[in-house]
């Protein structure tokens, strides 16, 4: 019995230690050290770091503005809140890369401003969505805001006092996560969305799970992984991986939306890998996320996705694909064709260990050609709901 108690204590202690470590969402402290040590050795990655620092410095040189929500997508206030999450993301990463606390202070100041604003907000005044947000006109944007901000918070966590963390978590992050999961007042449409098999739900689960990791809230992480009821039978990120992709990695909403959805899939998966490596998330369902990226590449021509359904002009250069290529190359570095995707179509890298290794291995001449092939990509969870066939000529003419 004593040995059993000690064993349980060691397992629980390991989980709690993993949750308490910062940074550990997009990168770990060891990976930050590797990127710092590699500075000056990979010019293409140095350019990425320079761009991050330039964006962070530009944020520092502008006054913090956290306006009361007033307009929809594209409006001045909407764009300000969108700009704010990018600014916090860049400053959080800049702090980790440089150790300069001016970047951490900027993030802290903005988070405290949001912590004062958020409790005063009802539903957004633009009532065009059945799932209205509070900061934004729809909850989807709120989820995207929280995904980026969770990374920033993770980056500066240890620079904050206990009082600052309590204020920010109590007045901003916890209420926002609860809202994304359940809505508020008489409108609980968010709960249905959170547990839905849909790309908006993937953003929602990623947001709640990532801020759960950053705040050391296992309850939020469990709801993100296994749905509101934590059973995995109704919703959650794991169920989304089961239901939204066919066995071939084809996304049920088509390539254009697969491009958008793969972003929260890979970024949250990276956080899960760092925080809960025992889940082996990148191996889940026969490495379904890697299959999803491979399928996206195959559903393109000269770097653009096939124009089917209601697809807009997007392709392998999209920022979502930069995330996917860099994160998944770091998981499967034997797939050297991903280096060609990055080199031929993207020309930019994530400020993460994956981005560093992609840029480094391209510089080493390790890229292999992208092999496009004739294929049938089945649709549906079991691959029995139709599909899309791609026939390619082997004649270069």
Description of each model-found segment:
Residues 6-15:
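Bacterial N-terminal signal peptides
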Residues 1-4:
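Positively charged n-region of N-terminal signal peptides that target proteins for export
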Residues 14-15, 40, 314:
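Hydrophobic alpha-helical membrane context
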Residues 15, 28, 369-373:
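Short, charged, low-hydrophobicity "junction" segments
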Residues 68-75:
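Aromatic- and acidic-residue-enriched carbohydrate-binding clefts of CAZyme catalytic domains
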């Amino acid at each position: 019995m004593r040995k059993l108690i000690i064993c349980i204590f060691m397992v629980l202690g390991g989980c709690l230690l993993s949750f308490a470590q910062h940074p550990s969402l997009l990168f770990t402290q060891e990976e930050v050290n590797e990127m710092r040590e590699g500075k000056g050795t990979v010019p293409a990655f140095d350019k990425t770091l320079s761009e991050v620092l330039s964006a962070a410095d530009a944020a520092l040189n502008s006054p913090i503005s956290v306006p009361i929500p007033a307009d929809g997508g594209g409006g001045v206030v909407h764009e300000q809140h969108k700009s704010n999450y990018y600014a916090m993301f860049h400053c959080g990463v800049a702090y980790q890369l440089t150790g300069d606390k001016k970047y951490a202070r900027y993030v802290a100041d903005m988070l405290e401003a949001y912590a004062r604003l958020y409790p005063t907000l009802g539903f957004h005044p633009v009532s065009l969505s059945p799932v209205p947000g509070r900061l934004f006109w729809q909850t989807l944007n709120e989820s995207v805001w929280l995904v980026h901000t969770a990374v920033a918070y993770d980056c500066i966590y240890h620079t904050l006092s206990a009082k600052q963390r309590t204020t920010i978590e109590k007045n901003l992050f916890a209420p926002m996560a609860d809202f994304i999961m359940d809505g508020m007042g008489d409108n609980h449409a968010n709960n249905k969305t959170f547990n839905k098999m849909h790309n908006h739900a993937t953003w929602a689960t990623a947001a709640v799970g990532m801020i759960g990791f950053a705040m050391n809230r296992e309850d939020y992480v469990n709801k993100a992984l296994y749905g509101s009821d934590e059973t995995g039978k109704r919703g959650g990120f794991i169920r989304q991986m089961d239901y939204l992709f066919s066995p071939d990695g084809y996304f049920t909403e088509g390539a254009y939306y697969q491009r958008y959805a793969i972003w929260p899939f890979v970024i949250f998966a990276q956080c899960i890998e760092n925080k809960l490596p025992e889940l082996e998330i990148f191996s889940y369902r026969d490495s379904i996320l890697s299959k999803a990226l491979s399928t996206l590449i195959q559903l393109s021509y000269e770097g653009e996705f096939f124009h089917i359904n209601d697809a807009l002009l997007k392709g392998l250069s999209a920022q979502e694909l930069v995330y996917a290529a860099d994160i998944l190359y770091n998981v499967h570095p034997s797939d050297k064709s991903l280096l060609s995707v990055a080199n031929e179509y993207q020309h930019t890298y994530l400020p993460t260990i994956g981005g560093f290794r992609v840029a480094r291995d391209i510089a080493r001449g390790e890229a292999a050609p992208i092999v496009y092939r004739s294929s049938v990509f089945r649709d549906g969870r079991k691959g029995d709901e139709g599909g899309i066939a791609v026939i390619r000529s082997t004649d270069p003419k």
